[in-house]
Each structure stands twice: as structure tokens, then as C-alpha cells.
Amino acid sequence: MLRTILIIVPLVIMLSSCSYVYDLHAVAMNGQLMFIVSPASSQQPECLRDIEVVEESGGRETLWSESVSYDDDSANEFPVVYGVALKGQHLTDRKEVSGKPFQRGVIYNVSATTGAMGYGGGRFLIDADGR
């Protein structure tokens, strides 16, 4: 019993320390909405394998959702252009949604997964001027 505990406890500690988080920012560049990793984030991933944009309130409609195989995550580097299909083998275990138009004055949440255990997120708003 003691031997099992001595093996399990370090394993749990090691596995729990493998994940990380980072902040995403929505920015307008060249007439497109792009998602970048915040320069202030302690983690600076270069690529991703999963992204989702949803309304923060109301019907919580999903505006864009895509996920590719873990093996293909390095094919999709930041910055990520809103609505542009991710490269690689798309996963079939969840519904994908192509990029839908935004509404002004609505707050949106963006979330992304990098590798197996990197998680990014952020919020953004399209203002009355469309910015």
C-alpha cells in the first residue's frame, strides 16, 4: 500500500504541472480579425490545434469551431485568422462551425488548445464602429 502511494503521489504532482494557460487577444490586421497570443502571457505558444469563438451571453451561439489532430498542431501558427480553416486532419468527434459574421456590441469569447495541455482564452467586442 505504501509503495502504491509513493508511486501515485509524485505521478499526480508531475501530471498536474504539465498544463499551462495563455491569454489571447483579438486584433484587426489587414482588414481581418486575427487572434494572437498576448505579449504579456508567461507562455508563448507558436501554434494551436483547436479554436472556438462563442457569444458570451444570449444564446451562446458558436460562431467558429474547429479542431485538428494533435499531430497537426504545428501546421497552424499564430496569428490565426478568424474563419480560415485550420490545416491538418480535422477531428470528427465534434461539430465544426465555419466562421459566421459578428454583430456589433456583442461580447465574444475565444478559446484555443495548444498541443495536449496548453489552453488559451480571451474576450473581445466588435464596437459600434465595427472595430
Model regions and ranges:
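Short acidic/polar inter-strand loop motif in beta-rich domains
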Residues: T114-G121
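Extended, solvent-exposed segments with strong compositional bias
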Residues: R60-V97
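Surface-exposed, short loops/turns at beta-strand junctions within beta-sandwich domains
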Residues: G99-G105
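Short acidic, glycine-rich loop/turn motifs
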Residues: E55, A112-T114
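Sec-dependent bacterial lipoprotein signal peptides
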Residues: M1-C18
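A short tyrosine-centered beta-strand micro-motif
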Residues: I107-V110
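N-terminal non-catalytic regions of secreted/periplasmic and cell-surface proteins
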Residues: C18-R60, G122-R131
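Beta-strand-rich interaction surfaces with strong enrichment in secreted/lumenal proteins
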Residues: L24, V97-G99
